[in-house]
Every structure is written in C-alpha cells, then in structure tokens.
Amino acid sequence: STVDLQFLGIDQEKDVEGLMDKITCLAAPFAPLDGMNDAGVSCGIYMTYQGGDETIPTDVDTDKPDLTSTTMLRLILDYADSVEEAGELVKQYDMHDSANTSYHYMVADASGKSAILEWTCGTDKTDNDGSARTLNVIYNDDDGRIGEREGASDFQWITNFVLQPGYYGGDDEKAGLDRYDRIYEELAATDGVLPDVNAAMDILKIVGRRDWNNDDGNGCTV
C-alpha cells in the first residue's frame, strides 16, 4: 500500500529523524490511500465533496463496530480475497470518514471484478447528515443504472463525484466530471484492456491534477 505521510502530520520534504515522527510512522500501515494485496485485490480512496455547500463527512452511528476511511482500506487489503469479500467485510462496520471530508472508494480483484462503494442519503442538496448515510455498492456487471456507457462497459472508472443515479440535480457541480470523461475515452479506445502498467500510468498522467487545466483543489483523486 502507499501512505502519504503528510496526512500523519509529518513533513514530507524532510527526513524522518525525530522520535515522535518515528513513533508516528508505526501507524503508517493503517493510513493507506490505496494498495493491492497478495490475492490481487486492490482499492483506492477518492474525495466526493458531499453535503451541498459544505462538505460533510460520513459518520454512521449504529450498533456496528466503527471504521475510518484508511482503516477500511487496511481491512480490505489484509482480509479480502475478492471484491465480494471486500464488500461483505465493509458492510459489518459503521463508516467514519477521515480528515473531515467525504469519500467514495473503488475495489477491484484479479478476476476483473470491481465495485464502487458510496455512502449517501438523498441528493447532493440534502445529503448533509453524515450519520444518515447508507452504503451503496455498484458492481461493474450491474452499473447500467449509472449511465448508458457504464452499462455497456465491462470496466469501471472513478473520480470525485457520487455515481448514484439521481444524486445530483441538473445544475449541481460534479467534481472531476471532465477527468471522468477523459478516462473513459482513453479506456474505451482499448475496450478497457491495457497492454501493461505503463499504459495505465500514461492515462493517470493525462488526468493528473497537477497538470490538468482546471481549479481542482482535491488531494485524494485520480
């Protein structure tokens, strides 16, 4: 898995030298932003800006055990051997988004199966109670409800807006929609099958936030 140490309060421009920083690094395995395990299950996290004018983190409060964004990824990487197992694991917990913002997640496995995990309640304009959200799992073989091109494709892709049908009104902003469209164009050109890891990295470079000509301010994104 990969971990951004700045999310743990460590200056990424300096070496880890102080005792407290070294102790903090012991927690790094539990703060992944993406990763893949030995069974071929991979997962990643992406900001979604849910809550209308003010982003509201998911904060589900039932009688289930609690889980944060990054510890959920750690759970999947440690214990899931397939997308289905990942989904069943996550359903056993209450989600509490990290860093005071909201996210959705994508999981894939070696069989080609994938799923997008989203916690929502109502529409973008009314989704302002993080405790009222429920988990929705969108599998790649059952995503025609999202849109025509999604239903016609065997692959999934994701950026920074919620994919649940009807979540946004006609005038609501969908963060990352332009990059979402570009990723689709690149993947559709080869029916979602890329020759090697370099080809995948090339697509990520095309839509990377540092080089993309817009005003995106997100940190957890494609």
Question: In which residue ranges do the predicted regions lie?
Answer:
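A contiguous strand-loop segment
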Residues: 1-64, 100-101
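C-terminus-biased signal that marks the final domain/tail of proteins
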Residues: 85-89, 98-102, 110-112, 145-222
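Aromatic-residue-lined binding/catalytic grooves and analogous aromatic/hydrophobic interfacial grooves
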Residues: 113, 122-158
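Stable alpha-helical elements in mature extracytoplasmic
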Residues: 32, 36-43, 69-73, 82, ...
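Catalytic cofactor-binding cores of redox enzymes
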Residues: 92-125
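Intrinsically disordered, low-complexity linker/loop segments enriched in Gly/Pro
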Residues: 51-102
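Short, basic/low-complexity N-terminal boundary segments at the transition from targeting/disordered tails
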Residues: 2-19, 79-89, 197-210
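Structured loops at beta-to-helix junctions and adjacent beta-edge loops in soluble globular domains
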Residues: 39, 46-48, 108-110, 119-120, ...
